[in-house]
Amino acid sequence: MLCCIRRTKPVEKNEEADQEIKQDGTKPEENAHKAATKIQASFRGHITRKKMKDEDKDGENDTAPDESAETEEKEERVSPSEEKPVEVSTETAEESKPAEQPNSPAAEAPPTAATDSAPSDTPTKEEAQEQLQDAEEPKETENTAAADDITTQKEEEKEEEEEEEEEEEEAKRADVPDDTPAATESQETDQTDKKEALDDSKPAEEAGKDQNV
């Protein structure tokens, strides 16, 4: 009995599943297929994205070697131009060596040029000194002129003071009665008159005395 029951139950389940399928109209297999297709599509998209990123990285890496190659080419182009001045400098040094030999006339020429340049420097110094002297002379003359003006002013002031003192003394003398010659003459005449009067009076007195006798 138990075996029969166990066998009958799954059959009932299948029937129920069939009924559900009939109602929905879709089978679980179809749902699983759809889910699988979605998963595959998403996986493919992920793979394609990775490929795109890898391609971008590869492109950048490709451009970087190209740039490095261009820079190397530029350096190679520049390096010969840099080497040329070095060669030119060595050539000029080699050319200058014979000129520096003691027996060559080129070696004797620079001292003469130096001697010529030395006198040209000395006149310039002398001219500068002369200019300084010329500039100092007007200053000295101005200073002397200023000193002379000061001395003359002082002398004039002294003279004015002396004149003022003399005028003051004269004014004082004018205020005080001076012993003029007229006054002295009048005094002398008065004295002479008095003497004459005395002389005249003496003979008269003598005559009176004689009469009395």
Curated annotation (Swiss-Prot):
Output the InterPro entries linked to this UniProt entry: IQ_motif_EF-hand-BS, Neuromodulin, Neuromodulin_gap-junction_N, Neuromodulin_P_site, Neuromodulin_palmitoyl_site
Per UniProt, the keywords (alphabetical) are: Calmodulin-binding, Cell membrane, Cell projection, Developmental protein, Differentiation, Growth regulation, Lipoprotein, Membrane, Neurogenesis, Palmitate, Phosphoprotein, Synapse
Residue ranges, compositional bias (Low complexity)? 102-122
The record's subcellular locations are:
Cell membrane; Cell projection, Growth cone membrane; Synapse; Cell projection, Filopodium membrane
Bias-annotated ranges (Acidic residues)? 57-73, 157-169
- Region annotated Disordered, chain positions: 1-213
* Cellular component aspect of the GO annotation: filopodium membrane; growth cone membrane; synapse
Q: How is it modified after translation?
A: Palmitoylated. Palmitoylation is essential for plasma membrane association.
Choose any GO biological process term that the UniProt entry carries and state it.
cell differentiation
CDD domains documented for this protein:
IQCD
Q: Where is the composition biased (Basic and acidic residues)?
A: 9-33, 74-86, 191-213
Where are lipid groups covalently attached, annotated S-palmitoyl cysteine?
C3, C4
Q: Name one GO molecular function term.
A: calmodulin binding
List, alphabetically, the SMART domains matched.
Answer: IQ (SM00015)
Quaternary arrangement and interactors, per the entry?
A: Binds calmodulin with a greater affinity in the absence of Ca(2+) than in its presence.
Q: Which family does it belong to?
A: Belongs to the neuromodulin family.
Task: State the function annotated in the UniProt record.
Answer: This protein is associated with nerve growth. It is a major component of the motile 'growth cones' that form the tips of elongating axons. Plays a role in axonal and dendritic filopodia induction.
Provide the protein name: Neuromodulin
State the organism of origin.
Answer: Carassius auratus (Goldfish)
Give the source lineage, highest ranks first. Eukaryota, Metazoa, Chordata, Craniata, Vertebrata
